[in-house]
């Protein structure tokens, strides 16, 4: 390899790194620096297939955790994500929302499909055994409270409510806390889609 070829390759690599760093700085969400590979998992998907994160390489993934009986934070989050996906217009097909339950006692694949379908039929839910779900929560730093009794019977759960932004190569790129609107997700997803 000639010196000229080496210099060209080095400058291209440096330029690409600089562009990615500049794009990361423009993200609204908190950035993972450096990005790291998102832990894969194997759960029951609400679409009837095995749910593996690696199945969605080539798409940007928004990974969230919650449960179908949640009455406040979860439906608001899913409404925001549905609006963001809609606002992506033609790029919507390059985004996958994955929503993993924190309530294995009540959320099976059928219930997750019905619940998520009310927001966007493209959303995929993940359910599984308590040990399977606990392992995924540990990998992603998701905490869940013990069951909190509610008037009239039943229970509620408190849980971490941030959303992971995973790029097309399967790397954790950013973490969006609860409370951001659709425009912030659209902004960050468009940046990740350019890379």
Give the label of every model feature segment.
Residues 1-5:
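Positively charged n-region of N-terminal signal peptides that target proteins for export
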Residues 38-39, 61, 160-162:
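Short loop/turn microsegments at loop-to-beta-strand junctions
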Residues 132-188:
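Thiol/disulfide oxidoreductase modules built on the thioredoxin-like
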Residues 76-136:
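Structural microenvironment flanking redox-active thiols in thiol-disulfide oxidoreductases
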Residues 54-77, 81:
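Short active-site neighborhood of thiol/selenol oxidoreductases, capturing the structured segment around
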Residues 6-16:
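Bacterial N-terminal signal peptides
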Residues 41-61, 85:
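A short beta-strand-turn-helix
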Residues 18-40:
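N-proximal helix/coil linker or "cap" segments that precede and/or mark the start of modular domains
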């Amino acid at each position: 390899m000639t010196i000229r070829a080496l210099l060209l390759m080095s400058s291209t690599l440096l330029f690409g790194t600089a562009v990615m760093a500049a794009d990361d700085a423009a993200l609204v969400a908190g950035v993972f620096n450096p990005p790291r590979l998102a832990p894969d998992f194997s759960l029951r998907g609400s679409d009837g297939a095995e749910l593996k994160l690696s199945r969605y390489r080539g798409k940007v993934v928004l990974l969230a955790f919650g449960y179908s009986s949640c009455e406040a934070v979860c439906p608001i989050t899913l409404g925001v994500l549905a609006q963001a996906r809609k606002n992506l217009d033609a790029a919507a097909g390059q985004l996958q929302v994955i929503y993993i339950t924190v309530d294995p006692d009540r959320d099976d694949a059928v219930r997750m499909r019905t619940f998520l379908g009310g927001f966007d039929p493209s959303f995929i839910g993940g359910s599984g055994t308590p040990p399977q779900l606990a392992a995924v929560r540990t990998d992603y730093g998701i905490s869940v409270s013990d069951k909190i009794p509610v008037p009239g019977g039943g229970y509620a759960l408190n849980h971490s409510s941030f959303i992971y932004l995973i790029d097309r190569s399967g790397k954790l790129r950013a973490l969006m806390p609860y409370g951001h609107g659709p425009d912030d997700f659209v902004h960050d997803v468009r940046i990740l889609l350019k890379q």
